[in-house]
Amino acid sequence: MNTDHTKRNLFELYAELIHQQEKWEGLIKAFLSDELRKLDVEHGSKSQLTMTEIHVLSCVGDNEPINVTSIAEKMNTTKATVSRISTKLLGAGFLHRTQLSDNKKEVYFRLTPAGKKLHSLHKYYHQKAEQRFLSFFDRYTEEEILFAERLFRDLVTKWYPSSEEIEGGLPSIFK
């Protein structure tokens, strides 16, 4: 058994999986873009959203009312990124600002009716993708699924560069 050859095959399959994931996201984004165009016609606006922006909108929908800090924590991103995205979503008419009666300083976000519609569509397709993913694993034994879980966890925690490696640039990542 040639382990190096098998590892190379795994790398090629990994690259193909990433490519397929990009195509899958493209299909979902194309559908959501069509729905956005319909919402634009209804509301007289023009908005093109990235998947990250749609995920911020979805985070608001799942947790409203919610502030910038909480969104950033839940999405594992910076407050600056959330602030920039929320400004765009506010301008596009998908979010509105609110303040709680006991704290007039803190700004919270809620979805507008257009935001609720987009959130609902995103949630529906997210659930369908999850069902498809879960049913995919029906063909495997519990032991194989546990190995897949370990592999995915290791990829998430050990494969991608650390913050220190990223700060050092590509030469430090590929040394």
Curated annotation (Swiss-Prot):
Its main location: cytoplasm. One of its GO terms (molecular function) is DNA binding. Residues 10-157 form the HTH marR-type domain. Keywords: Cytoplasm, DNA-binding, Transcription, Transcription regulation. Signal peptide: none annotated. One of its GO terms (biological process) is negative regulation of DNA-templated transcription. The keyword Cytoplasm applies. GO terms for cellular component: cytoplasm. SMART domains: HTH_MARR. It is found in: Cytoplasm. Residues 68-91 bind DNA. This is Uncharacterized HTH-type transcriptional regulator YhjH. It comes from Bacillus subtilis (strain 168). The lineage of its organism: Bacteria, Bacillati, Bacillota, Bacilli, Bacillales.
